[in-house]
């Protein structure tokens, strides 16, 4: 197991279908101690159902700097240092995903960018003092960042911003021997995807475009995440890794 006794923070587990949960499972399979964050008490109830009894759960609302700071202070007090961070958090108002891009509201734009992109910067700011040399930060993105995907409007813009943030963070943190990368995951029926209009059609079309005509799983994304967090990925810096069964090829 290549993550034996490593402490890794996983942000964004909503339920058992979450990509973040696939990441957490893969990390645990490789021996990591997973620390979960949750937005509020309602979300905590979902995480409790999945986490092991002795796992550390910490409240962290990424819309609040004070909440992020408090979360990482708690993590520091409980485990000392960490060896990885998985950022699987995104949000946009449903009405900002479909229709005309030119109709996106200022408030909707700012909210999506704040939660989906800026949060990676904010979380990294407070996590950095805890991260050991050799640590890996991984975030989740999607093909809609670089192609115009129907009904993905605002989130596509936010994901493009997120991917650029990955590159700049990777450049900054390389001096501290901390790697930052992103995973561009294929369309999977998660809670987040169900907010996209005609999501069943999106998933069906995506699956048809894979060379083997089958969709990617949260476990496959999770395995790549575990690799990127680990020392095995020491040469992978500032990259966006496609884990979509080849959808991006066509």
From Swiss-Prot:
<feature type="binding site">
    <location>
        <begin position="61"/>
        <end position="62"/>
    </location>
    <ligand>
        <name>NAD(+)</name>
    </ligand>
</feature>
<feature type="binding site">
    <location>
        <position position="159"/>
    </location>
    <ligand>
        <name>NAD(+)</name>
    </ligand>
</feature>
<keyword id="KW-0444">Lipid biosynthesis</keyword>
<dbReference type="InterPro" id="IPR002347">
    <property type="entry name" value="SDR_fam"/>
</dbReference>
<comment type="similarity">
    <text>Belongs to the short-chain dehydrogenases/reductases (SDR) family. FabI subfamily.</text>
</comment>
<comment type="pathway">
    <text>Lipid metabolism; fatty acid biosynthesis.</text>
</comment>
<keyword id="KW-0560">Oxidoreductase</keyword>
<keyword id="KW-0276">Fatty acid metabolism</keyword>
<comment type="subunit">
    <text>Homotetramer.</text>
</comment>
<protein>
    <recommendedName>
        <fullName>Enoyl-[acyl-carrier-protein] reductase [NADH] FabI</fullName>
        <ecNumber>1.3.1.9</ecNumber>
    </recommendedName>
</protein>
<feature type="binding site">
    <location>
        <position position="39"/>
    </location>
    <ligand>
        <name>NAD(+)</name>
    </ligand>
</feature>
<keyword id="KW-0443">Lipid metabolism</keyword>
<feature type="active site" description="Proton acceptor">
    <location>
        <position position="142"/>
    </location>
</feature>
<dbReference type="GO" id="GO:0030497">
    <property type="term" value="P:fatty acid elongation"/>
</dbReference>
<dbReference type="InterPro" id="IPR036291">
    <property type="entry name" value="NAD(P)-bd_dom_sf"/>
</dbReference>
<feature type="active site" description="Proton acceptor">
    <location>
        <position position="152"/>
    </location>
</feature>
<feature type="binding site">
    <location>
        <begin position="188"/>
        <end position="192"/>
    </location>
    <ligand>
        <name>NAD(+)</name>
    </ligand>
</feature>
<dbReference type="Pfam" id="PF13561">
    <property type="entry name" value="adh_short_C2"/>
</dbReference>
<feature type="binding site">
    <location>
        <position position="89"/>
    </location>
    <ligand>
        <name>NAD(+)</name>
    </ligand>
</feature>
<feature type="binding site">
    <location>
        <begin position="18"/>
        <end position="19"/>
    </location>
    <ligand>
        <name>NAD(+)</name>
    </ligand>
</feature>
<keyword id="KW-0520">NAD</keyword>
<comment type="function">
    <text>Catalyzes the reduction of a carbon-carbon double bond in an enoyl moiety that is covalently linked to an acyl carrier protein (ACP). Involved in the elongation cycle of fatty acid which are used in the lipid metabolism.</text>
</comment>
<keyword id="KW-0275">Fatty acid biosynthesis</keyword>
<feature type="site" description="Involved in acyl-ACP binding">
    <location>
        <position position="197"/>
    </location>
</feature>
<feature type="binding site">
    <location>
        <position position="12"/>
    </location>
    <ligand>
        <name>NAD(+)</name>
    </ligand>
</feature>
<dbReference type="GO" id="GO:0004318">
    <property type="term" value="F:enoyl-[acyl-carrier-protein] reductase (NADH) activity"/>
</dbReference>
<dbReference type="InterPro" id="IPR014358">
    <property type="entry name" value="Enoyl-ACP_Rdtase_NADH"/>
</dbReference>
<feature type="binding site">
    <location>
        <position position="92"/>
    </location>
    <ligand>
        <name>substrate</name>
    </ligand>
</feature>
């Amino acid at each position: 197991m290549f993550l034996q006794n490593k402490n890794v923070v996983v942000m964004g587990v909503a339920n058992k279908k979450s990509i973040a949960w696939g990441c957490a499972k893969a990390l645990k399979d490789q021996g990591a101690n997973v620390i979960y964050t949750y937005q509020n008490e309602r979300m905590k109830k979902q995480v409790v159902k999945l986490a092991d009894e002795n796992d550390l759960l910490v409240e962290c609302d990424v819309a609040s700097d004070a909440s992020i700071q408090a979360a990482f202070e708690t993590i520091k007090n409980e485990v000392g240092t960490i060896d990885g961070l998985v950022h699987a958090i995104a949000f946009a108002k449903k009405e900002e995903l479909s229709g005309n891009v030119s109709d996106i509201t200022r408030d909707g734009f700012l909210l999506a960018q704040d939660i989906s992109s800026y949060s990676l910067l904010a979380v990294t700011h407070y996590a950095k003092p805890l991260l050991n040399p050799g640590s890996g930060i991984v975030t989740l993105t999607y093909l809609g960042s670089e192609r115009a995907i129907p009904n993905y409007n605002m989130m596509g813009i936010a994901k493009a911003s997120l991917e650029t943030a990955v590159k700049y963070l990777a450049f900054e943190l390389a001096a501290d021997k901390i790697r930052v990368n992103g995973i561009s995951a294929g369309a999977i029926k998660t809670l987040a995807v169900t907010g996209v209009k005609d999501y069943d059609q999106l998933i069906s079309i995506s699956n048809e475009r894979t060379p083997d005509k089958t969709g990617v799983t949260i476990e496959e994304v999770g395995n790549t995440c575990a690799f990127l967090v680990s020392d095995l990925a020491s040469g992978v810096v500032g990259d966006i890794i496609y884990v979509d069964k080849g959808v991006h090829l066509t």
